[in-house]
Design a protein with these regions (language model features):
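Secondary-structure end/capping motifs
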Residues: 110-188
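Conserved C-terminal helix/tail region of periplasmic/extracytoplasmic solute-binding proteins
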Residues: 182-214
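Short, glycine-/small- and polar/acidic-enriched structural segments
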Residues: 1-57, 73-76, 94-96
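Residues within well-ordered alpha helices
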Residues: 41, 84, 180-181
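Pocket-lining segment of extracytoplasmic ligand-binding domains
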Residues: 59-142
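Short aromatic/hydrophobic-glycine micro-motifs
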Residues: 47, 90-91, 186
Length: 214
């Protein structure tokens, strides 16, 4: 799964570039991918000591409302909230893409994981073949939010909808992510590929999903 995260400021903000957020408060949903994406975008635009963040609600709608009330200078949103923010006049000062992921415990068999991989692969192919059709799911998923219900599929920027078929986790990417998070105090200990990635189950599952004999 590929996720688009956008660093968003209110319509009245004087900030137009991520560099201008140095020493200004950015609200992040700590513990989620959007928060890490936010730190990455800020880190690339200023010295680490200038990155200023605070914990914010996990509810994207409430976070956007707080941004519009002026409670902080910026936050990071995903779709459909990026589109809602743009409709409200907000500006995107930076965007990035990152891998969403899932965690399987030891009880998940290669067969179950293979079924999951097949289902996700089929979904990715269908959505990539007609993204405009499937962005309507963003609207369907928030039946009680008037702003989202007012959106039409044509309102979405399809360039922000990116999907990739699932595959084995590249060790160098997993190592980099771990070490980067550790450098921010978000992880402790050294990266251990054998402890973090069950290659035996992963390999068997992907072979089963692809119909390759074991």
């Amino acid at each position: 799964m590929i996720v688009c995260g956008a660093l968003v400021v209110a319509p009245t903000s004087t900030v137009f570039t991520p560099q201008e957020l140095a020493h200004k408060m950015v609200a992040l949903d700590y513990g989620n991918g959007t928060a890490y994406a936010g730190i990455l975008m800020l880190e690339g635009a200023m010295p680490r000591e200038a990155v200023t963040t605070r914990a914010a609600t996990l509810n994207s709608g409430d976070r956007l409302a707080a941004l519009l009330r002026g409670e902080f200078e910026a936050t990071v949103l995903q779709e459909p909230w990026i589109t809602i923010a743009e409709k409200a006049g907000c500006r995107l000062v930076s965007t990035t893409f990152f891998h969403g992921t899932w965690v399987a415990d030891r009880s998940v068999s290669p067969e179950a994981y293979a079924a999951f991989v097949r289902a996700v692969t089929a979904a990715v192919r269908r959505i990539n073949a007609d993204k405009r059709r499937y962005v309507s799911y963003f609207i369907r998923d928030f039946p009680d939010h008037a702003g989202i219900q007012a959106l039409a599929p044509a309102d979405f920027n399809l360039g922000r909808i990116q999907l990739k078929e699932p595959g084995p986790i590249p060790e160098h990417e997993a190592r980099w992510a771990w070490e980067w998070m550790a450098s921010w105090g978000l992880m402790s200990g050294r990266f251990d590929a054998a402890a973090q990635i069950n290659r035996k189950v992963e390999e068997e599952a992907h072979k089963l999903a692809a119909g390759v004999p074991g």
